[in-house]
Amino acid sequence: MVKLTSIAAGVAAIAATASATTTLAQSDERVNLVELGVYVSDIRAHLAQYYMFQAAHPTETYPVEVAEAVFNYGDFTTMLTGIAPDQVTRMITGVPWYSSRLKPAISSALSKVGIYTIAN
């Protein structure tokens, strides 16, 4: 599985337009791409858990781009552009392990690329 650090490095190029300590809105596309990178990495690392969650919550849908990114082990960051910020938030916060696993990983990944967020 792809490590979080490699995902963070992959999206660093997109976030490169941000300075070392840039503060951005949570809905900024650069923030969303880092979040989605962590999310895709987490799905890859815990695929069975996501399948079980999907089976238990069939109305929780994901954009096709996320599924393609999960199974495409190349550079997927360009696939994830254009996903609406509210949809990113819904997907990421909608899983039971958001607080315990995703939120800390997202905070770490954002920090590594020098992005800090403010509420919209």
Swiss-Prot record:
Statement: the UniProt record of this protein carries the keyword Signal: yes
Name of the featured protein: Seripauperin-10
Residues making up the signal peptide according to the UniProt record: 1-20
GO terms for MF: structural constituent of cell wall
UniProt superkingdom: Eukaryota
Pfam families reported for this sequence: SRP1_TIP1
GO biological process, one term: fungal-type cell wall organization
Family under the similarity heading: Belongs to the SRP1/TIP1 family. Seripauperin subfamily.
Cross-referenced InterPro entries: SRP1_TIP1, Yeast_SRP1/TIP1_CWP
Keyword list, A-Z: Signal
One of the record's GO cellular component terms: fungal-type vacuole
